[in-house]
A protein has these predicted regions:
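Metallo-beta-lactamase
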Residues: 2-20, 24-36, 53-111, 155-174
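Short, conserved loop/helix-junction motifs that constitute active-site signature segments
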Residues: 42-45, 74-75
Length: 196
């Protein structure tokens, strides 16, 4: 997988295209801190960065190959970490969940999906059309329809694909699941189903 090389694809430029200033970004919820997910943090120096404690701890003390995956220069500017612990078992459609900081709108949950990274999480947001859950790298790039064989899936992205598939089937239009690395145009419009 390659990181975007076109500056227009960066979050900073996308925020500007939407008519906002990067200083308007007050909160960033990361699924994990791998280099391909945290590279834009310095572009939003005043934002609070929300993260699950096991992921922050793994990134601050990486060992072996993880030193390359967790580049400290992405958070050398000293972000304001908002660190989450202790998910409530089964609190969100049977998944363990953590309620985010009180007062944030819309309602959000952090859903631990550990496997791809030590503290990997999904981020679920309640919308007027149901829940939208950014599954990060716990879901294959092409969504559930493109799942690799289970053994490969478990090795690369963790053990959650079968549960996420069951959630999508049980809840239908009430929950929309999105993988990481989805082109921006795929994020527009409500399909009422898992993105494929």
């Amino acid at each position: 997988m390659r990181s975007p090389r076109d500056p227009e694809e960066t979050a900073w430029h996308q925020v500007r295209r939407l008519g906002y200033s990067p200083d308007d970004v007050r909160h960033i919820f990361l699924t994990h801190l791998h280099l391909d997910h945290s590279g834009g943090l310095p572009d939003f120096p005043i934002a609070s960065v929300h993260i699950f404690r096991p992921e922050l701890e793994a990134s601050l003390r990486p060992r072996g190959l993880l030193r390359w995956i967790y580049p400290h220069e992405h958070w050398a500017h000293g972000p304001r970490w908002v660190v989450y612990d202790a998910p409530r078992p089964g609190a969100w459609f049977g998944f363990d969940a953590i309620e985010t900081v009180a007062g944030l709108d819309p309602e959000m949950r952090i859903i631990p999906l550990v496997g791809h990274a030590p503290g990997h999480c999904g981020v679920a947001v309640r919308t007027d059309k149901g829940w939208l859950m950014h599954c990060g790298d716990a879901l294959p790039f092409g969504g559930l329809a493109s799942s690799p064989p289970e053994a490969i899936s478990r090795l690369l992205i963790g053990p959650h694909v079968p549960r996420l598939r069951a959630l999508a089937l049980e809840q239908g239009e009430r929950i929309r699941l999105l993988p990481a690395h989805v082109p921006l145009q795929k994020l527009t419009g409500w399909k009422g189903q898992v993105e494929t």
